[in-house]
């Protein structure tokens, strides 16, 4: 246990998910998910409805139990701990505010349960804790050895027992649940120590301390003029601030946010996005944020985990995911895209749209003559004059032009019946003939995705 903790601190990982599997009855919701989150990061779990992103959040928060795998918090497996024993807080989609309490009452609620260190701890209690830790450690080690023996014994029995028999099922069930048995004893000493300290080393907050803490957090989130208001009198944005204040006031290591901005209108949502990022950076907290909104994820996150059907397709910075998606699914899910079937050629070239183009890729990534997917983002395409000296111009005809405020989104038909989309500040008339061009680093090549339905074409 000590080694795991040391490794986690060294890596600065506050959360580590290791081979997490989650099943609801016979349905596999999470399939061997591995994820590490560093202390102070803003990490977004991004995916469509039903992808498993909220399930991951609920597992970290303790609202669901993993079927298999480990959930490590500062190096200790906590998957069997209840939510109140984890040093984190959660903001739900519906805010879960108490309607019978005013703003101040909602915010201070958690402080009534909070404990802070006593100024003076009796020496006899310190000595008693040292003796207790020794006893608890010996007990945990003894129980872990017993688990090791049982696991080896049951695994050997399964080799000879007939599948489907009562004894086989019983042994298999024990082995399937063994992660939780090990997890309990791995964190046993820490949990007993925390219980002891809460009783003898800590005290409740005084009324003066509570009032001071509430005033501080109220000012931080901009609610100083709304302390005495009823929850029913607040706008959606103000309710969001109350939920945030209530979560932050207990000083958690991690804040979990389950699509907290989805119910807000566009303008308030944009303001709250900026506000959340400012708060996170100011307090240097770890935020784990769930959303299906790609723009929101790109704007807020230090790293994004893109989730598809219970698996993490890509985990990286917003720039890396947008510019260098791992496959066609990620490319289409994140932002607008033009994706074409292509063939990788020698000398870092690609055959695309019946022409050869230079790329930044090499033969360490793809085999010569390998079929690949080629991505070109609409904003990376230039519309040029026929006479302009640009290598490998593509000729096309504009079939649609949509004004989107700061740019026009143009659909161009190519001679081989392909279509390509372009973002440009200049408008062009429908049926106008144009020439398209792009730079060498605008073409991003990806391995073919075995799970993608290429016949469907659309996302």
Swiss-Prot record:
Residues 115-203 are annotated as: Insert. It comes from the Bacteria. Gene3D superfamilies: 2.40.50.100, P-loop containing nucleotide triphosphate hydrolases. SMART domains: AAA. One of its GO terms (cellular component) is ATP-binding cassette (ABC) transporter complex. It catalyses: ATP + H2O + polyamine-[polyamine-binding protein]Side 1 = ADP + phosphate + polyamineSide 2 + [polyamine-binding protein]Side 1. Residues 15-334 form the ABC transporter domain. The complex is composed of two ATP-binding proteins (PotA), two transmembrane proteins (PotB and PotC) and a solute-binding protein (PotD). PANTHER family: SPERMIDINE/PUTRESCINE IMPORT ATP-BINDING PROTEIN POTA (PTHR42781), SPERMIDINE_PUTRESCINE IMPORT ATP-BINDING PROTEIN POTA (PTHR42781:SF4). This is Spermidine/putrescine import ATP-binding protein PotA. It comes from Mycoplasmopsis synoviae (strain 53) (Mycoplasma synoviae). The lineage of its organism: Bacteria, Bacillati, Mycoplasmatota, Mycoplasmoidales, Metamycoplasmataceae.
């Amino acid at each position: 246990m000590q080694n795991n903790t040391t490794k986690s601190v060294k890596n600065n990982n506050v959360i580590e998910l290791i081979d997490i599997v989650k099943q609801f009855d016979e349905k596999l919701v999470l399939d061997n998910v591995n994820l590490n989150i560093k202390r102070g990061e803003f990490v977004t779990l991004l995916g469509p409805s039903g992808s498993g992103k909220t399930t991951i959040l609920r597992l970290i928060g303790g609202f669901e139990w993993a079927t298999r795998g480990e959930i490590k918090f500062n190096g200790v497996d906590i998957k069997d701990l209840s939510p109140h024993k984890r040093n984190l807080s959660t903001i739900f989609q519906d805010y879960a505010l108490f309607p019978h309490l005013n703003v101040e009452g909602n915010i201070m609620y958690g402080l009534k349960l909070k404990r802070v260190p006593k100024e003076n701890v009796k020496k006899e209690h310190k000595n008693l804790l040292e003796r207790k830790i020794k006893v608890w450690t010996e007990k945990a080690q003894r129980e872990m050895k017993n688990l090791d023996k049982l696991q080896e014994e049951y695994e050997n029995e399964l080799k000879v027992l007939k599948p489907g028999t009562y004894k086989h099922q019983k042994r298999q069930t024990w082995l399937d649940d063994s992660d939780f048995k090990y997890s309990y004893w791995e964190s046993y000493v820490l949990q007993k120590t925390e219980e002891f300290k809460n009783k003898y080393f800590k005290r409740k907050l005084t009324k003066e301390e509570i009032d001071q803490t509430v005033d501080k957090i109220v000012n931080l989130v901009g609610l100083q003029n709304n302390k005495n208001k009823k929850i029913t009198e607040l706008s959606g944005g103000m309710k969001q601030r109350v939920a945030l204040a209530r979560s932050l006031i207990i000083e958690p290591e991690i804040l979990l946010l389950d699509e907290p901005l989805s119910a807000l209108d566009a303008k308030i949502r944009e303001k709250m996005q900026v506000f959340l990022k400012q708060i996170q950076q100011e307090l240097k907290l770890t935020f784990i944020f769930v959303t299906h909104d790609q723009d929101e994820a790109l704007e807020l996150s230090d790293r994004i985990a893109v989730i598809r059907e219970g698996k993490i397709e890509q985990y990286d910075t917003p720039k890396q995911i947008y510019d260098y998606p791992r496959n066609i699914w990620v490319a289409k899910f994140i932002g607008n895209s033009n994706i074409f079937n292509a063939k990788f050629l020698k000398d870092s070239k690609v055959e695309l749209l019946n022409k050869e183009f230079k790329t930044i890729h090499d033969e360490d990534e793809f085999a010569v003559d390998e079929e690949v997917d080629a991505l070109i983002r609409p904003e990376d395409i230039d519309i040029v004059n026929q006479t302009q000296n640009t290598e490998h111009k593509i000729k096309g005809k504009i079939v649609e032009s949509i004004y989107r405020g700061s740019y026009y989104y143009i659909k161009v038909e190519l001679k081989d019946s392909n279509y390509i989309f372009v973002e440009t500040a200049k408008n062009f008339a429908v049926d106008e003939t144009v020439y398209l061009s792009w730079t060498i680093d605008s073409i991003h090549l990806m391995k073919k995705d075995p799970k993608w339905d290429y016949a469907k074409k659309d996302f």
